[in-house]
Amino acid sequence: MSKVKSITRESWILSTFPEWGSWLNEEIEQEQVAPGTFAMWWLGCTGIWLKSEGGTNVCVDFWCGTGKQSHGNPLMKQGHQMQRMAGVKKLQPNLRTTPFVLDPFAIRQIDAVLATHDHNDHIDVNVAAAVMQNCADDVPFIGPKTCVDLWIGWGVPKERCIVVKPGDVVKVKDIEIHALDAFDRTALITLPADQKAAGVLPDGMDDRAVNYLFKTPGGSLYHSGDSHYSNYYAKHGNEHQIDVALGSYGENPRGITDKMTSADMLRMGEALNAKVVIPFHHDIWSNFQAAPQEIRVLWEMKKDRLKYGFKPFIWQVGGKFTWPLDKDNLEYHYPRGFDDCFTIEPDLPFKSFL
């Protein structure tokens, strides 16, 4: 049978998706983290894979879903948090712009699955299914109450889940995970469609969202989930040693305040007393697209005058960051390859061919 007759939409999808195959899965498994360091990979949105010097693997907010895929319904879902925030009716054109760099069903070595909150782009049923089917039967699922409720609803056994709230500490091998206050005001207006937010005091944030501080033998990582800017970052900076901080950055559409701005990112880095501040989340949604270089430009304008003790780092999805080896780097580039050029004799018609 000819190829053009045997190929189907389904075979095309299976042959190309996920776009990176198991490349990153293999890279993470093969990584030997040196003493006094930790390594992490950006999985897209606020998804992070963290690996310690002891070989402990945890993932946070790993999400494998999509945004809008059709113009079919021109209206926003009734009661959506963005509708509540801005009084809009039109469909939000949030298309996923980032490739799938990690295959959840190729994960074999993992010690904990975490989520910061229950928004669809931060917790994933496919990840839960893959870990339940293919990994050790004692891998815990750690998150605030709303996340645990989701996991249990999907079929994760209750005894595999750990509910955390600010102040809680969970030890996973050589990583100490501190749950801290979250500052995600959008989470507070994420309500059932028939429930009104106007004139009603919101319920507590602690059941809905947390930030995390991962303390490893080689350094610490602060994951802020979808938090907006808050003065309380300074409190966290006073109470903890923070080496690297991750913040949700984006270009907010008119009438919307859902992501931190470049100025907010610098304020967060300063307040946390971090050594490195890294933006994320700006990669994922087409309508929140932002230029992270803006953070670096603003940092250059202010760093000497305000005596900043941190540097920004502009990352790429699927890329690795190693603390402290990369602490003075300002921007990531994917490995370029060809480092072994001329280890064998070139096969060219003549030397000056190129």
Swiss-Prot record:
Pfam families listed in its UniProt record: Lactamase_B_2 (PF12706)
GO molecular-function term, one example from the UniProt record: manganese ion binding
UniProtKB keywords: Cytoplasm, Hydrolase
UniProt entry tagged with the keyword Hydrolase: yes
Domain of life assignment: Bacteria
Gene3D superfamilies tied to this protein: Ribonuclease Z/Hydroxyacylglutathione hydrolase-like (3.60.15.10)
Annotated EC: 3.1.1.-
Compartment(s): Cytoplasm
Biochemical pathway: Cofactor degradation; L-ascorbate degradation; D-xylulose 5-phosphate from L-ascorbate: step 1/4
Annotated transmembrane regions: none
Function of the molecule: Probably catalyzes the hydrolysis of L-ascorbate-6-P into 3-keto-L-gulonate-6-P. Is essential for L-ascorbate utilization under anaerobic conditions.
Cited NCBIfam families: PRK11709.1
HAMAP family xref list: UlaG
Record-linked PANTHER family: L-ASCORBATE-6-PHOSPHATE LACTONASE ULAG-RELATED (PTHR43546:SF9), UPF0173 METAL-DEPENDENT HYDROLASE MJ1163-RELATED (PTHR43546)
Protein name (record): Probable L-ascorbate-6-phosphate lactonase UlaG
Source organism (scientific name): Shigella boydii serotype 18 (strain CDC 3083-94 / BS512)
Gene: ulaG
